[in-house]
């Protein structure tokens, strides 16, 4: 184990292989157990907490997902992946105003800044974070009942999609959200 609860470079390959295998086999409960163990061993690494949040979301354990995401954010609030995942967890619990504060933080910075920040992983990764944050902004507006703003965000997300740029959201999901904006029942009728 690295000093002070940090992961050492030579340990990452073994851990990455284990994570990839468990994800590929959709062994979400085993993956959760593995990540809990890693988060205790490497208690200063926000990565494991962020991954735990994602797994808990998959398992529909939204309160737990939020707790892991919050802890990751407390450890490393400058990491844009941590911020993005925290937004996701907050929106899942309808903590809309808290989520919007972080959405605005990501919107304010350039893609280049995100790409080459301390925890940045390059331009494609940063474009993915920025565009998927636009989708989450749409979710925020949809939950607030601001349908025109929500539709605009989802449409921009769709327009900004590019081959080779990963998204957490399928095109089908985005189109469904746009349709939801168009056919959302009016609060007065």
List each model region and its residues.
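Alpha-helical segment of the N-proximal tetratricopeptide repeat
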Residues: 8-41, 47, 51-54
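"A position-specific structural signal for the A-helix of alpha-solenoid helical repeats
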Residues: 17, 51, 85, 129-136, ...
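Conserved structural position within tetratricopeptide repeats
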Residues: 39-40, 70-74, 104-108, 159
């Amino acid at each position: 184990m690295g000093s002070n609860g940090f992961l050492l470079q030579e340990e990452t390959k073994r851990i990455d292989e284990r994570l990839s295998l468990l994800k590929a086999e959709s062994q979400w409960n085993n993956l959760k157990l593995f990540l809990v163990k890693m988060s205790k061993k490497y208690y200063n690494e926000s990565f494991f907490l962020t991954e735990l949040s994602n797994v808990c979301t998959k398992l529909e354990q939204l309160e737990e997902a939020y707790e892991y995401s919050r802890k990751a954010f407390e450890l490393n609030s400058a990491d844009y992946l941590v911020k993005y995942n925290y937004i996701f967890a907050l929106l899942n619990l309808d903590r809309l105003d808290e989520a919007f504060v972080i959405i605005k933080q990501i919107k304010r910075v350039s893609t280049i800044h995100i790409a080459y920040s301390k925890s940045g992983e390059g331009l494609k990764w940063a474009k993915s974070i920025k565009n998927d944050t636009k989708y989450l902004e749409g979710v925020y507006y949809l939950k607030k009942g601001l349908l025109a703003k929500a539709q605009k965000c989802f449409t921009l997300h769709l327009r900004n999609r590019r081959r080779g740029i990963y998204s957490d959201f399928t095109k089908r999901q985005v189109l469904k959200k746009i349709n939801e904006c168009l056919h959302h029942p009016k609060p007065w009728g």
